């Protein structure tokens, strides 16, 4: 939740530890408990290749000071309703990490929250859709149940199926969004339907 490595270094914010800093203590403990059930794998992590390694740490600190956003971790998470959906969206599923456009140096444009990103700025060069409630360019015509269905099954209202990174997060490796409780998927849907509608045709 702070991006600090075991040797005290700071990782680049490619790992979204800023949003994760708002995850509830009870959920962090559950996540760690789950990770400790996995079979150990001995595999060294390759060093990130930069021309001057020292600059990587300096750049990370500078970026975080200028643009980083950290949160206070609550003891427990909201249990229901839109507040539950907001918590899951912003600190667990971190939907905005992909669906909010970023600048060339990775700064999220929070005025375009969830409004999608074109292939030139989307993660891994993928087109990321606008999921605000805008009825023309977003998903404002979708019912809450349809949003929940997509999160769990990957199926859109037109019976098409998601692809790319969204498919990956739904399926997961051992677990993914498909394992989400339906009431949590509906809470996320309710929150997404409550955010500002932004007209942004992604291309």
Q: For each predicted feature, which ranges?
A:
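Extracytoplasmic/periplasmic, Sec-exported soluble proteins
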Residues: 7, 23, 76-81, 90, ...
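Extended, well-folded interaction surfaces typified by the phenylalanyl-tRNA synthetase beta subunit core
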Residues: 43-56
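The canonical Cys-X-X-Cys-His
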Residues: 31, 85, 92-102, 147, ...
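Sequence context of c-type cytochrome heme-c attachment sites
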Residues: 1, 15-18, 68-72, 130-135, ...
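Periplasmic/extracellular electron-transfer cofactor-ligation site
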Residues: 3-10, 38-41, 90-125, 137, ...
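Membrane-embedded segments
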Residues: 2-3, 8-19, 25-34
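Electrostatic cytochrome c docking/interface patches
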Residues: 61-90, 107
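Electron-transfer interface patches adjacent to heme c in soluble/periplasmic c-type cytochromes
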Residues: 18-28, 112-156, 169-185
């Amino acid at each position: 939740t702070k991006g600090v490595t075991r040797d005290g270094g700071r990782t680049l914010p490619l790992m979204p530890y800023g949003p994760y800093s708002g995850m509830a203590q009870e959920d962090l403990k559950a996540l760690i408990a789950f990770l400790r059930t996995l079979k150990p794998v001995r595999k060294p992590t390759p060093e990130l290749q930069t021309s001057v390694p020292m600059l990587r740490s300096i750049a990370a600190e500078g970026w975080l000071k200028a643009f980083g956003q950290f949160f206070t971790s609550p003891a427990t998470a909201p249990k229901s309703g839109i507040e539950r959906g907001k918590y899951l969206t912003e600190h667990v599923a971190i939907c905005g990490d992909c669906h909010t456009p970023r600048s060339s140096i990775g700064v999220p444009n929070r005025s375009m929250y969830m409004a999608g990103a074109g292939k030139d700025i989307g993660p891994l060069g993928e087109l990321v859709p606008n999921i605000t409630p805008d009825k023309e360019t977003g998903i404002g015509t979708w019912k809450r149940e349809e949003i929940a269905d997509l999160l769990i099954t990957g199926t859109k209202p037109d019976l098409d199926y998601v692809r790319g990174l969204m498919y990956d997060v739904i399926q997961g490796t051992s677990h993914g969004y498909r394992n989400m409780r339906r009431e949590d998927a509906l809470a996320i849907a309710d929150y997404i339907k409550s955010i500002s509608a932004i007209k942004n045709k992604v291309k």
